[in-house]
């Protein structure tokens, strides 16, 4: 079972997850401070690293526009040939309901191939959860590790309408996980994005 959507108070399993918490740096993870209102984009770049015969991924956070980002390294993780990533985005004051994103969750899991787009629809409130299973394709693997590029989530709708968050992915030699949305944040509002990347085959 993946970790619940909450502010982390204890150590994280470095192979399972990472998070960005607005105006807060916890467990050595990156801290992002937003300025004003409007679109927020956080890019988490994961590069393949080979160290002592171990296949590792090194993650850094940065490239935030319409705001400022504190960039740091946060974890290494083994990748096997089949990997699932779950992305959760939440906006709220102390993880309470605020600005239309609440406590509901919507999820789905399926395989994705190069260039394939996924979409799921939910209500106008709720945390958005998207599971995507990345299956190894020989043409797009490197040293037996499945890595993907330009995996993005965007398209939050508000005002009582449905949400359609598009997930796209490509299998290439490097990974960029981009989470974007038309999230409106006030000074007293927390902004929480977590991602979980872990091997399915040990």
How would you name each of these model-derived features?
Residues 70-79, 168:
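A cross-kingdom feature marking solvent-exposed beta-strand/loop segments within repeated
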Residues 1-25, 201-202:
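Enriched but not universal
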Residues 44-46, 85, 101, 132-134, ...:
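Fold-core signature of tandem repeat domains
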């Amino acid at each position: 079972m993946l970790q619940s959507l909450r502010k982390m108070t204890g150590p994280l399993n470095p192979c399972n997850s990472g998070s960005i918490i607005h105006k807060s740096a916890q467990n050595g993870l990156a801290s992002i401070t937003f300025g004003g209102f409007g679109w927020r984009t956080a890019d988490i770049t994961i590069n393949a690293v080979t160290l002592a015969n171990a296949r590792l991924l090194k993650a850094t956070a940065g490239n935030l526009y319409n705001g400022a980002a504190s960039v740091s390294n946060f974890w290494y993780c083994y990748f096997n040939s089949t990997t699932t990533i779950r992305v959760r985005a939440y906006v709220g004051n102390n993880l309470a309901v605020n600005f239309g994103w609440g406590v509901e969750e919507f999820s789905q899991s399926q395989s994705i191939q190069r260039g394939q787009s996924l979409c799921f629809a939910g209500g106008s409130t709720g945390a958005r959860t998207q599971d995507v299973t990345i299956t190894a394709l020989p043409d797009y693997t490197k040293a037996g590790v499945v890595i993907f590029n330009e995996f993005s989530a965007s398209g939050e709708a508000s005002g009582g309408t449905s949400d359609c968050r598009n997930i796209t992915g490509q299998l290439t030699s490097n990974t960029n996980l981009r989470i974007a949305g038309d999230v409106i944040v006030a000074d007293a509002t927390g902004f929480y994005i977590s991602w979980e990347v872990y091997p399915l085959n040990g």
